[in-house]
């Protein structure tokens, strides 16, 4: 499956949908990826968050829990959230079929603050997974080019779905905001989705904060993040 196909994309963690085994496996995958990025220094302390899309109708995501060391997560350290990024467990407003899973699996109940933006990205782009880290290069690039980082004629652009030559790719930059509705609106304003002739841009820099990247699944989201970070390093080094 490819990323950025739009809201109709079937990118979900498992065709089985929202089940105990699917949620447990998703939690383990998120914990492993979080440890990877913590080791790189991209998720210092409790910073950063990751998500996996579990279902689309209605939209349900597993998001890493708030306030936990991202290098020490377990498969239970996730929160099930809806299309607004709100917890869907027992007692939550509009709770759905996932009520019992939070209790039976001992899942967390407080999602990361940016869960709302993860949900917005999953809905708008059709992504199956999203990653948000506090990588220094992305922050530096957002400071250097607040209107967006222009990349072209770089080989690694192929890794994020673009041509290595003759194509101008812009990694969008938005201002940081604590209100995820505002930040989500800004994301939609600058999002460059796929067209018949060019691929989407699967990354977003939030100024003075960090970077989001997404993909059809967690592995592709990781590739997009790592490649975008490397491309930003080149842009800064050659300006």
Question: Where do the protein language model's features map onto the residues?
Answer:
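Glycine-rich flexible loops
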Residues: 2-239
């Amino acid at each position: 499956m490819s990323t950025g196909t739009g809201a109709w994309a079937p990118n979900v963690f498992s065709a089985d949908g929202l089940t105990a085994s699917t949620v447990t496996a998703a939690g383990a995958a998120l914990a492993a990826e979080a440890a990877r990025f913590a080791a790189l220094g991209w998720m210092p302390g409790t910073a950063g968050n990751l998500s996996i899309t579990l279902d689309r109708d209605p939209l349900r995501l597993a998001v890493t829990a708030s306030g936990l060391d991202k290098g020490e997560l377990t498969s239970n350290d996730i929160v099930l959230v809806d299309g607004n990024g709100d917890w869907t467990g027992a007692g939550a407003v509009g709770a759905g079929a996932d009520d019992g899973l939070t209790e039976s699996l001992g899942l967390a109940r407080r999602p990361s603050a940016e869960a709302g933006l993860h949900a917005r990205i999953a809905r708008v782009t059709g992504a199956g997974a999203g990653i948000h880290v506090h990588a220094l290069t992305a922050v530096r690039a957002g400071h250097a080019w607040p209107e967006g980082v222009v990349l072209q004629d770089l080989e690694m652009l192929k890794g994020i779905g673009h041509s290595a030559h003759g194509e101008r790719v812009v990694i969008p930059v938005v201002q940081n905001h604590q209100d995820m509705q505002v930040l989500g609106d800004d994301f939609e304003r600058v999002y460059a989705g796929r067209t018949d002739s060019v691929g989407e841009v699967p990354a977003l820099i939030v100024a003075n904060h960090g970077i989001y990247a997404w993909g059809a699944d967690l592995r592709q989201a990781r590739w997009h993040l790592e490649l975008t970070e490397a491309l930003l390093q080149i842009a800064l080094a050659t300006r």
